[in-house]
Regions:
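Residues lining hydrophobic/aromatic ligand-binding pockets adjacent to catalytic sites
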Residues: 1-310
Length: 310
């Protein structure tokens, strides 16, 4: 997921093309400070020589237009990406957290989000400008709702009703997918809402979620979006936090021994085969934090899926 990692030089990117144009920024975590090396936006053209679709994550943190309709920095960055893409290249965008999150961090605490499932913020501030910028290159939209502790969770039926009302009030689109990061909320009520609106179920290998196989079985074999596609995301090993996995995986240039959980590759391939058998398209997005280096994880999955090509 995402791109422009200097750790992928020699795998995805050619060193000579970017050597003098790698930017650096410092990321601060409780475990320490980490220097991130980032390639220029134009490197996306080389990314697409290896993979047909890119998941862009930065739209999760800020919308494309502000409340007054003015373009944000993300609007301009996304336009820059589009300039380096061909007509065959595709993009998945993450819907802004401001739309999907029940709570947001403010002043060191998590407080109720006043913009939660705001149809206008989504439609005017994100969806419309995304379609304007990307056109046919927009292959999918991922809504991600944060993990909710048991004492803060709404009943599954209430949460399903909230999403039902939201989807009733935004433009219908067959490219939408929803990732719910609370296992208890993966309910029949939710799956019925997704089916009603043609929204796909994201199968996510993430910290506090049950296994991919369990998520797949809960919905009766996954739920594709209206265009018939299924999304699988390998984000972190189960039971491991963002900080733990980031610290272990940085600088994302190699696999980390023991980090990729046993069975993850096999479960992923099992789901790929199930989706293919029903005649659907599967999009697989892999985070470096799932095992150290996303391209090498993708290679392992490809070899498991088609061993004769190794």
């Amino acid at each position: 997921m995402s791109d422009r990692y200097a750790g992928w030089i020699g795998q995805i990117y050619t060193r000579e093309r970017y050597a003098a144009r790698i930017s650096r920024r410092t990321k601060k975590l409780r475990s320490g400070q980490f220097v991130e090396e980032v390639l220029p936006v134009e490197s996306v053209a080389e990314y697409y020589t290896h993979f047909p679709v890119l998941e862009i994550d930065f739209t999760f943190y800020r919308s494309l237009l502000d409340r007054k309709g003015n373009p944000t920095q993300n609007y301009h960055v996304l336009r820059s990406y589009r300039q380096h893409m061909t007509e065959d290249d595709g993009v998945f965008l993450k819907v802004p957290q401001a739309v999907c999150a029940r709570k947001v961090r403010k002043g060191g605490a998590y407080v109720p989000n006043p913009d939660y499932l705001d149809a206008g913020l989504y439609t005017d501030g994100f969806f419309a400008p995304a379609c304007e910028i990307l056109g046919e290159a927009l292959h999918g939209l991922i809504f991600e709702q944060e993990y909710q502790r048991r004492d803060e969770q709404a009943p599954p039926e209430v949460m399903a009703e909230e999403w039902d009302r939201f989807f009733d009030n935004v433009p219908r689109d067959p490219r939408r997918h929803l990732e719910i990061r609370t296992g208890r909320l993966l309910s029949r009520a939710l799956f019925d809402v997704l089916g009603k609106h043609g929204v796909g179920q994201v199968l996510s290998h993430w910290t506090w979620l049950p296994s991919l196989r369990t998520q797949w079985e809960k919905s009766g074999g996954g739920l594709p979006s209206g265009d018939g596609s299924q999304v699988v995301r390998l984000v972190t090993p189960r039971g491991k936090t963002y900080e733990e996995t980031y610290t272990a995986a940085h600088p994302f240039d190699a696999m980390v021994e023991g980090m990729l959980h046993d069975g993850t590759v096999e479960e992923t391939v099992e789901i790929i085969r199930g989706v293919v058998q029903r005649g659907s398209r599967l999009y697989l997005f892999i985070n470096n934090r799932a095992g150290g280096n996303a391209p090498l994880i993708a290679q392992r999955i490809a070899r498991e899926f088609m061993p004769e090509t190794d």
